[in-house]
Amino acid sequence: MKDFGKNNKDSGYAIFLPAISNFYVRKISQHYAGTTDMFPPERIPQGFEHGLDGLNIFDKEKGYVYYSHGLYSAGHANLDLEGSKIDDGMVVNRNREHTILVGDSGGYQIGSGAWKLDWTNFEDGADWKKVRHDILKWLEEYCDYSMTLDIPLWAWLPQYRGRTGLKDPEDCLKKTIFNHEYFINNRTPGKTKFLNTLHGSNWQTSEMWYEGVKHFNDKSVYGDRAFEGYAMAGDHAGDAELLLRRLIRLRDDGLLGQADQDDVWIHTLGISVLPWGAMLTAVQRQLREHVNPNITISFDAASPYITASKGLAYDYPDLNGN
């Protein structure tokens, strides 16, 4: 077994999170539940002594490759808590002493209109009430860190507006604030640590969003119900200047760790190119030295699963002199 996550906590590097494919999770979970006949023993190649059990990256005993951290979206999960133990068993039944799961809230599925919801009755519609409740409870039950239920800033753009009816960035922010208030008022403190999702396509929209939601992380306002970390979305992932300016504002506002808060997780969504991995590591080290020693930065990508779905594989580079 190769342990690729053994130094995640102590190395000082920003932590890479594989965004785990729902299709992959479902097939491994069906194997555990005995609900599929897609993988008879004769289909398992020689050398795979643990069969499909070995394909579970969270299984430290049987996994051919073990990795301690991952990201999985509520937008792909079975939100029925008991049903999820079967359909998403690979991730939700993991050994939580040795693994960390960051949960995405499903904002992409909502903002893109993939989930059919009644946008004309956003606050009081039965479908919206159920979605908010089910996502909150799933994240609390199965994730160590969880993103808040945002309505992404891009959801008002023309290609999505016909499905969502959103008029402008302010409309996205207003609805996000409503969802945040629901999470604050209905969460069970201690079950998961929530990451306040920060959007922005430029400094102007980033500031608008930040000013609208920053108080949700303020313990002097919400006590132990306050959100504990941040998810950097929109152009914060990809625009280094925008990200750094946002972190400086968070520092100056005293929101990178308050009072007894000994764990501040900052996730940068959907970026994993090597230069950004190096940059985020440098940023984490500086924040730990000068602001709060308990800050952790992570970043994610679905590349391992997308690559495999296209019949491709990673290999080590040839570094000889020729």
Residue ranges and their predicted role:
Residues H180, I184-R187, N217:
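Short, well-ordered alpha-helical segments in soluble proteins
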Residues P189-N322:
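Glycine-rich phosphate/ribose-binding loops and adjacent secondary-structure elements
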Residues M1-F183:
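Non-catalytic, usually N-terminal nucleic-acid engagement modules in DNA/RNA processing proteins
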